[in-house]
Amino acid sequence: DTACSSSLVSVHMACQSLRAGESDLAVAGGVNLNLFPEEFISRSLAGMVSPTGRCRAFDAKADGYVIGEGCGAVILKRHSDALRSGDNILAVIKGSAVNNKGHSYKRTGYTGQSQQALRKKARKEGGAEPGNAGYVAANGTGSYLGDPIELKAIKNVLGQGNPSERSTCWISSVKTNIGHLEGAAGIASLIKAVLALQHEGIPRHLHINELNPQVSLDDSRLAIAVERQPWPRSGKSRLAGVSAFGLGGANAHVILEDAPSPVPRPGKVDRP
């Protein structure tokens, strides 16, 4: 249990198990149900929930998160095994990482240095070049103080990119679409990123009119996806980063890559 990063941490742990040969198939995910009014009351009294009922992640008027319900799960196998079995591969996990900065964590603000270290660790593991990232499924909760810290961390790691290739890297948060699923938030972001790869388009980030004044993206290759953005397949792999940060300081980051083109399989022949 790492709070809001739990489901993405489960994906990371499943990947470790597969790499170590402890398992051949894993199901990772999370679920969040709000069954008791005390959950709403406590979060409201703590000033965590948006009084307007809108998650305005990265917006100048961000005022808290919106509680959501949902569940999600993914089936994971080693890439070589999935290819050999002829499975329908939706995406490839190129790298993943987890870290913890609980001793310096504050409820209203994440630690930017730990986020940068986390993203660099995941990219180093997967051998992913920062300039190849085309999409970031950010944590983006709607925190006026926490959101710009995350954007600055993303900018420091991905903002400059490869000098010879400065294609835009789009940012959005699934919490503006379906609310904050807390323990299941990470898997929701992961599934959204997989769908973006599959459908060759980055979904629109909602409820943003003006970027939080504490951060600027003008001098970087980063941009908020205020409209749906086409993300077609090209000659090189497309990469997406997925982040989830837990209330106690446990952070998780997963890097996704294009699924390989499906190999045509001979159809069944009707026999008389």
Regions found by a protein language model. Give the residues of each.
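Condensing-enzyme catalytic core of the thiolase-fold
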Residues: D1-P272
